[in-house]
Amino acid sequence: MASTNFDLEDQKYLEDVNAVKQWWTDSRWRYTKRPFTAEQIVAKRGTLKIEYPSNTQAKKLWKILEERFNDKTVSYTYGCLEPTMLTQMIKYLDTIYVSGWQSSSTASSTDEPSPDLADYPMNTVPNKVNQLFMAQLFHDRKQREERITTPREKRSSVQNYDYLRPIIADADTGHGGLTAVMKLTKLFVERGAAGIHIEDQAPGTKKCGHMAGKVLVPISEHINRLVAIRAQADIMGTDLLAIARTDSEAATLITSTIDYRDHAYLLGSTNPSLQPLNDLMVAAEQSGKSGEQLQAIEDSWIAQAGIKKFDDAVIDTINQGSFANKKELINRYLTAAKGKSNSEARAIAKGITGMDIYWNWDAPRTRGGFYRYQGGTQCAVNRAVAYAPFADLIWMESKLPDYKQAKEFADGVHAVWPEQKLAYNLSPSFNWKAAMSKEEQLTYIKRLGKLGYCWQFITLAGLHSTALISDQFASAYAKQGMRAYGELIQEPEMERKVDIVTHQKWSGANLIDHSLAMVTGGISSTAAMGKGVTEDQFKS
């Protein structure tokens, strides 16, 4: 075993600890809560310091969003499918999004397509980030080489794009427990992501934000995920952005009642004469019933159970009783019970009504053991307020592009955390034509920006735009042959001066030729862009 100078070892450790403490004093972290210490972080680092490009990209992203939030403007983007799309997006948009939905359907690391259930291997989205980030680096090198080898008097005619737009990627629910979240975060940092978002659904039952049947985890469990992301990023020395998504606006189930902050939104049965639903269903199955018969039994039980939130059960008890000043009693109860656990709310209700109100959250539990839950905008606000100290941005998944709802959410969050940056999904799952007029569509992003939604994105625009042009071209090509290619693809490319019209140059053939010439002393008989290359036809 190698001998160790313990004094030097401890000195280096303390120097690193002090460096982390100094890092955390940066204004970047002025709203960030860390329930761990710099000593704990440094102790989990190796002795070889690695500088990750992700850190540069994260700092760049933070600067963009800080400026947007302060100016009440917006950085908006959409889900990128592959490098061709990336190189066109960077001309006009300042961030790039990588969608788990798109990756699930088109880029699983098993090559098995799937809907957005996050049942693909956890390296799927990081691999897509890596593909795009490597393309960014390559096209940036290609552009620099072309510019620096062009005389200054002609250089203004050479493109000068920022290929290194920060990438924000979908981490779904983290693909497992907290160690999985940390490993997934590590993958994203290693692959070049500037930020990731993680949602508060349960991993085994995760659904697309616009599917039914979503099951939440308790608030505390999702906070642990956010802390795990920050801890892993800190271990790696990066400013990676963590975006907290809540699916609570439309959720109907939750895994546990352990967190008192969830209690106000849990549902319970108010009919004491009914046996628990699961007991009834097990007995029905054992008697030979199945399928539609079981569904009918469950529907009948639900209809009789009087399922509601505890607050509503208290309000109904007061309204149905012989109390004087019912409105005053209701307001008194709601004020006193706000933010309290169910046991505390029960005691408050008994003190006001003089009775124990029957309300049982175990009775309606599902066969999977989940508790029933009533989401909504205020439910999402409740969760967002809890997540805010641990998240750089917060996103509420919603059913519709509803400005009034978006304002209610933003106002609710900013009443507690006025500095909180927000994100918004401009989802293709919405019927935009039915939702608003063309004039409203034109201003929707800007109007949301005024509310603090400084980062907005169309998750699947890459998928849909690819499908549309593919359908248009395939249909025309089948009928018109090469005329379709000329009219629908090549001529519009040339008119718009899309760089990929000269696809050999776009792919970096010149860069590779020059690299070969460099290592062969300037002579190469196999240059890809030499005499005979067909792209000479496109020179004006």
From Swiss-Prot:
Query: Where is the catalytic site?
Result: C208
Q: Quote the EC number.
A: 4.1.3.1, 4.1.3.30
Indicate where this protein resides in the cell.
Glyoxysome
> Which reaction equations make up its catalytic activity?
D-threo-isocitrate = glyoxylate + succinate; (2S,3R)-3-hydroxybutane-1,2,3-tricarboxylate = pyruvate + succinate
Gene Ontology cellular-component terms for this entry are:
glyoxysome
Q: What Pfam families does the annotation carry?
A: ICL
Subunit structure, as described in the record:
Homotetramer.
Q: Protein name, please? A: Isocitrate lyase
**What is this protein's gene name?**
icl1
